Each structure stands twice: as C-alpha cells, then as structure tokens.
Amino acid sequence: MSHNRRKFLGVAAMGAGALSISSKLFANTSDSNQHADIPSVIERLKPMKDGVIPISVEERKQRIAKAQELMSREKIDGIFIEGTTSSFYFTGMLWGQSERTFGLVIPAKGAIAYVCPKFEEDRARELINPVFGDEVRCWEEHESPYALIAGIIKDRGVKYNRIGMEERVRFFIADGVRKVAPGFEIVDATPVTAGCRMYKSDAEIALMQRSNDVTIAAYQAVFPTIRDGMSQAELSNNLTAAFSKLGYNGGAMVNIAKYSALPHGSIVPQTIHEGDVILVDGGTSCEGYASDITRTIVLGKPTQRQLDVWNLEKAAQDAAFAAIKIGVTCESVDFAARSVIESAGFGKGYKLPGLPHRTGHGIGLEGHEWTNFVKGNMTKIAPGLCFSNEPNISIPGEFGIRLEDCLYIGKDGPHFFTKQSKSIEQPFG
C-alpha cells in the first residue's frame, strides 16, 4: 500500500499525544458528500482506547543516546531533522513542513537544539519537551536558518566535519547548509535514523498490536454490511465511521472487480455486484504506530478461478512467513513468495499477470518505512524488525487478490499481529 509511502501522520503540530492517520490517505474510494445511514452494527462499536501506554520519556532518551552512538560509528558530528516523523520519534513533537525552516539538531554529543522562525518561538516552546534540550535558536524572516543549523553543531564540538541530513529533509535546506558551511560535508543520516527506527521496542510493538486489533475490529463490523449495489464510496465511508466509533482515525482503499487488479486502485467510481472480488486495504494508528491490513473477498459464491487464485495467494503469503528466520536476508522472503506464484504459471519477476511489486515493506511510525522484502535487499532479519507480508496476484482486466498481514520479529522469530485469513469465505481467521 502506498500514498506517498502511506505516511500515517498528520501535518499539524502535535505534542506527545497520538499521531493519527487521516482517512484522506484512502480518499480515492471515499466520498465526503455521501451521507448514507451508518449501519447499526457500526453504531454499536465501543472505543478501544483503554490500556494504551504512550512511549515514555525514558525510552525517547534511550533513542537519542543510540542515535549519538550511531553518529560516532558513522563519523557524523550531528544530524538535522525537520519537524516530521523522526522528530516525533526522538522527542514526541510533530511540527510539519512549510517553506520556513523548522527542525532540530541532534549532536553527536550534548543536548538537542531547535531551529525556529522567531515569530513561531512561543508555539514551538509549547510543544518542546525541555528534558531533551530547551535551546531554541531563532531566525527572523530576512535571516538565514542554515547558519544556525551549522552553528549548533560547531558549538557542540566538531570532530569529523560531517553533518547528516535525515531523509525527509528537503533539498533547499541541505543545500542552504552546504553553502553557508562549506567546511562541512553534507551526508545522509539514514544509517542513524533508520538504525534506530527500524528496530522496534516492546512498547512500540504493543502500540502496533493495538492499531492492528482496531483495524480488524473495524473490518469485522463492516464486512457483513457489504451488499449488491453498494458503492465503493459507501463501503469506504462505513469503514471510516467504524474506526471513528472505535476511537481512532482510519480508513481504507476499496477496489472492486477488475480494479482490484490495480495494486493501488483506480479513480473510477465503482459499484459492488454479486460475484465481484472486493479488495479492502487500510489501517489506522495508535500513538502514531501504524497498521496496514488487506482482505480480499467475493460477494456471494466465488468462481473456481477466483478460488484458485485466492488459494495461491494464501500459499504465497504462507511461504513468505515460513521463510522468515533470524539471520536470513530480506530478499529471500520475497523469493519464497514469488516462487510459489511463478510455479503456478504466473509471470516471472514482476511481469503480469503475477506479482508486480515487492512482497512486503517495513512499518512503524510510517506505513512504509525501512526495510523491505525485495530482491537485492541483503539486510538480515533481526529481532525488532516489523514488516507487512503482502504478495499480490494481479490479473489485468479480470481481478486481483491481495492478503496483507503485518508481523514483528521476536527473539524466537516472526509473529503476526493478526490472524491470517483462513479462506475466501473466512477473511478473519
């Protein structure tokens, strides 16, 4: 699933409260002007907020310390992060992006400091947790923020003359720092940020478990309401309403019949009819941590062709899971799933009809993050990694089948967050 790597975050400033997925991320199937009555089964849903434990200040301190260790290993004096997901990861603050530079510097040694437009300082200080560092260096509208970024790193101590830029930092900022601080080499900070964020703690996995549980609860409430003549938009709106009743922002992409063969759907309005394949791909987030679940069913009795392809897809998903062992490469998981589909006569590699994309992606604070089950990825499976497992069989002009469940790697190997579909008639295990 991908809408700009399907970021499960808003762009408004937030404090340590929950990030929330916007149902607009799935808006290609939703019609905000539709006011269909919400089915009673959805109205009866109760919030699933009890027992949610946010990430602690102590854990965020440990993340910063790990980032500083990785900077030393990578020979980086400090990294700059805009007010996006990595800012939330390390400090609990999400600011967003505009044409005005705002962000934070994590130095290899010393406390975090922030770079902020002067007129935004009061708002920034409302959101900043001073336990991580309370220094805010401000720039007026006619001044350069880039010298402030370099200045923080210089003042904390320079050893390698290298400044790391987090992957979401825009070019004009990185280039601005390069121009005002020519003595520094500008480098990629992904080995630091991904080196931290890829490996989830027990607390993070617990939050992801909740977001997956909520998604399944929403699906289980809504799927029985599917009927002949229902529009794609009505089904999508029902899913959004179910998430809301459960206390979360969420939604799903819905694609029907031949449009289910398009992995990320179509803008064409669709209506459900008896015998159609219906693919629902969506999720929510809990304290920012995402779920991503796909279920594919048929309204009414499936044809033998639909049943055979569904069962093949399930076999491919099972093969991927069976291939996941601590120490094996991520590409080997993709190979396992793809081999099942190819052996049934479907296209080699990414050719259609067949599996047109990787078998799975990393997931955490973003719906798509490091690392992927894909050819060429030699990253080794290790505890703390989290992935989607979603081989997909696309048959253009006919239909597509995708089953998607996310999983985490424990010390003893892989564990699904959700029960897999048992059959085309039993999508919830």
Predicted regions, residues:
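Active-site neighborhoods and metal-handling regions in enzymes and metal-associated proteins
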Residues: 2-429
